[in-house]
Amino acid sequence: MFARISTIITTLFFAMLAAATAVPRTDPPPATGSQCTAVGGDVNCCNSVQDASNPIVGLLAGLLGIVLGPIQGLVGLTCNPISVIGGGNSCSSQTVCCTGNNFSGGLLVIGCSPINIDL
């Protein structure tokens, strides 16, 4: 009886150990400003970046009379375009590359992804 319980406990221990083993992430690194413009995107400084499925995004789109449809990914809120080339630009919020539509002067921008840029 003790051998059976010992075997079960040992098996469970190794199963939990295997489940807790760290696996490296395979996410691609964020794009840079030059990669953004190469794909036809615009570099923006957004006060907030939300998942498209966030109810706040749907509420804001509804208030603006925008029909977004089934979109996925990130949506920038209250965004201002910034130039990759030249000085004087700064972004104290989230720097993103947006390849989708820009609504209401940057209040809502779809198709955004975070980028690394030194401003």
Swiss-Prot record:
Residues 1-22 form the signal peptide. It comes from the Eukaryota. Disulfide bonds join C36-C97, C45-C91, C46-C79, C98-C112. Its main location: secreted. Changing V84I: In strain: Horst 97. One of its GO terms (cellular component) is fungal-type cell wall. Keywords: Cell wall, Disulfide bond, Secreted, Signal. It is found in: Secreted; Secreted, Cell wall. Pfam families: Hydrophobin. InterPro entries: Hydrophobin, Hydrophobin_CS. GO terms for molecular function: structural constituent of cell wall. Belongs to the fungal hydrophobin family. Aerial growth, conidiation, and dispersal of filamentous fungi in the environment rely upon a capability of their secreting small amphipathic proteins called hydrophobins (HPBs) with low sequence identity. Class I can self-assemble into an outermost layer of rodlet bundles on aerial cell surfaces, conferring cellular hydrophobicity that supports fungal growth, development and dispersal; whereas Class II form highly ordered films at water-air interfaces through intermolecular interactions but contribute nothing to the rodlet structure. Self-assembles to form functional amyloid fibrils called rodlets. Self-assembly into fibrillar rodlets occurs spontaneously at hydrophobic:hydrophilic interfaces and the rodlets further associate laterally to form amphipathic monolayers. This is Class I hydrophobin 2.
